[in-house]
UniProtKB/Swiss-Prot annotation:
Record pathway: Secondary metabolite biosynthesis; terpenoid biosynthesis
A GO biological process held by the record: novofumigatonin biosynthetic process
Keyword Oxidoreductase recorded: yes
Entries under PANTHER family matching the protein: ALDEHYDE REDUCTASE II (AFU_ORTHOLOGUE AFUA_1G11360), NAD DEPENDENT EPIMERASE/DEHYDRATASE
Entry's Gene Ontology molecular function annotations: ketoreductase activity; oxidoreductase activity, acting on the CH-OH group of donors, NAD or NADP as acceptor
Organism: Aspergillus novofumigatus (strain IBT 16806)
Entry similarity comment: Belongs to the NAD(P)-dependent epimerase/dehydratase family. Dihydroflavonol-4-reductase subfamily.
Protein name: Ketoreductase nvfG
InterPro entries hit by this protein: Epimerase_deHydtase (IPR001509), NAD(P)-bd_dom_sf (IPR036291), NAD(P)_dehydrat-like (IPR050425)
Alphabetized UniProt keyword annotations: Oxidoreductase
Phenotypic effect of disruption: Completely abolishes the production of novofumigatonin, but accumulates asnovolin A.
Any matching Pfam family: Epimerase
EC number: 1.-.-.-
């Protein structure tokens, strides 16, 4: 990590929502490694989570707070006492086909967090975890965009489709998820512009996340699909190709940059390493685990993902801030996943 002035100094406490989640646990781990303290939100007691981080980083550096409702003002107010930065990774009420639940709920939660944080002078940075699906990379049929995606492009199609009666039922959960991120991200940036709080807000937009799972109790949708392939289960994602992948630890690095780097302000960070196909994934898994005869064949894929222009800037941030060569490769990402999951 680069030395110099950071928005949140080492030793400060960062709040990470959904700390027992796949991405949030990776972010928590990196923050602890860099000398920060973490207060993680969970929906119920997770003694294994406290034990995992305390065993590796000592007592007093990680704690959990139970928040069952992200719109609970009183609980949030208490949770933000002494907090210098927030990584809002959890997605409240995400997986529903009803947009009244799946879209409006998470948006209200984000605005609630911003409003409460504005009353705490200690908060200097907030980072929202979004998705590359908040940009217009693919349509409802999985076809890639025909024009390059830039940092001011939004997936307005998803917002429209979320409320349309003609949207196929099997697509609604994913569409609603993208729509919630579009609406939440856009309204958060507008809220900051309108209210001029004492903190900045940045947004990290991960692609299909692949990499190490820290603990057996941690799961993530993307890694469930990879583990399923190792067990001989064809993934439903064969029918829907995510346009880009990203290593989980690179996602964590970009969250840290968004929290700490003064020059990164009110930015959407496109966390996308490279396009991929399921044929590539299957081929690499077979190389990594040659004795595994269960891994199914992947279908032919002739689609060419869209060009995500801002991904280059995200990679440069990792190079400059962490001194790395760039994004982690798909092979290395899968290797770490197989090592921990096989």
């Amino acid at each position: 990590m680069t030395q110099g002035k950071h928005c949140v100094p080492q030793g400060s406490t960062i709040l990470v929502t959904g700390a027992n989640g796949y991405l949030a646990s990776a972010i928590t781990k990196l923050l602890l490694e860099l000398g920060y303290k973490v207060r993680g939100t969970v929906r119920a007691p997770k003694p294994w989570l406290n034990h995992y981080f305390e065993e590796r980083y000592g007592s007093g550096n990680f704690e959990t707070v139970i928040i069952t409702d992200f719109q609970d003002t009183d609980t949030w107010d208490q949770a933000l006492e002494g907090i210098s930065g927030i990584a809002h990774v959890a997605h409240d009420m995400a997986w529903s086909s009803d947009p009244n639940i799946a879209v409006r709920g998470p948006v209200k939660a984000i605005l609630n967090i911003l409003d409460i944080a504005s009353k705490h002078d200690s908060v200097k940075r907030i980072v929202l975890t979004s998705t590359i699906g908040a940009a217009p990379c693919i349509d409802i049929n999985g076809n890639p965009a025909t024009t390059p995606v830039n940092d001011d492009d939004w997936n307005d199609f998803a917002v429209e489709a979320a409320w349309s009666d003609s949207t196929p039922e099997e697509q609604r959960v994913y569409i609603n998820h993208c729509a919630a991120k579009v609406e939440g991200d856009r309204k958060a940036l507008q809220w900051v512009q309108d209210n001029q709080p004492g903190f900045d807000v940045n947004i990290v937009m991960p692609g299909f996340s692949v990499g190490r799972i820290l603990h057996a109790s941690i799961t993530g949708q993307s890694m469930r699909e990879i583990v399923g392939l190792l067990q001989g289960k064809p993934t439903k994602m064969f029918e829907f190709v995510p346009p880009w992948f990203i290593n989980t630890e690179d996602v964590a690095r970009l969250h840290v940059i968004a929290l700490l780097k003064p020059e990164v302000s009110s930015q959407r960070i496109f966390a996308c390493a490279s396009p991929f196909t399921w044929k590539e994934v299957v081929s690499i898994l077979r190389e990594l685990d040659p004795s595994n005869t269960l891994i199914p064949d992947a279908p032919d894929e002739n689609r060419r993902p869209c060009h995500v222009i801002p991904a280059t800037e995200a990679e440069r941030l990792i190079q400059d801030f962490f001194g790395r060569n760039g994004f982690t490769s798909l092979r290395d990402s899968l290797a770490s996943a197989v090592t921990k999951s096989a």
